Amino acid sequence: MVFPIGDDNTGRTRTPYITYLLIALNVLVFVFLQGLGTNEQFTYAFSTVPQEIRTGEDVARPVRIEVGDQSGTIPLQPTPGSVYLTLLVSMFMHGSLMHLLGNMLFLWIFGDNIEDDLGHGRFTSFYLATGILASLAHVISTFTFGDNPFIPSLGASGAISGVMGGYLVMHPHRRVRVIMLRMLTEVPGYVAVGLWFLFQLISAFGVIGQGPQSGGGVAFMAHIGGFIAGAVLVKLFAVGSRPAARR
């Protein structure tokens, strides 16, 4: 397992204001709107529910969920406005403090480089677009593989996966500091990001048809969808922007 903890930012010329702002927004939403995870009414109102996205109709009632030999009830809440708003809002919410910290670490490592490539405005659009596409990938896979469509999803990892897909394309040889086999070392970006993506693929195929809860609550298809979207779209978003100083 390879765990990134930083990278070489030599050649970066822009201060990554948007990356810092996104990190701040995620923290503020978790602390003040989600009440550090205790405000279930807000969390279940704005999480993305595949059934709602498919039908366009809000599901505001307790829903019984069964995963393997375990079962429980999810108290889905009414969503103010359109249910499609959850595709955007849910990417700023998290299920736990560790969920938040892990995502923000990856955004801090990889986001600044892509923001430097695209510029502040384009990076904002790129981040939001890949996040929404990641959520849609999760929705589509839910119905394709017969997972429970009432299980809500949330988190910035889909958008951050998009950033990592862009990083693989734009910075394949940039040195990334990682913890690998309990040792601190540096590897090229294509190794760090490529191994991460390989893990997502293996994990996704292991839980297909069993729902995200069987994979520890991780929506792996959102990660895969966001990553592919980022890898495909980053050059399009970079058209017309100045080239990054170093790859």
Map each language-model feature to its residues:
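A detector for small-residue-rich transmembrane helices and their helix-helix packing motifs
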Residues: M1-R247
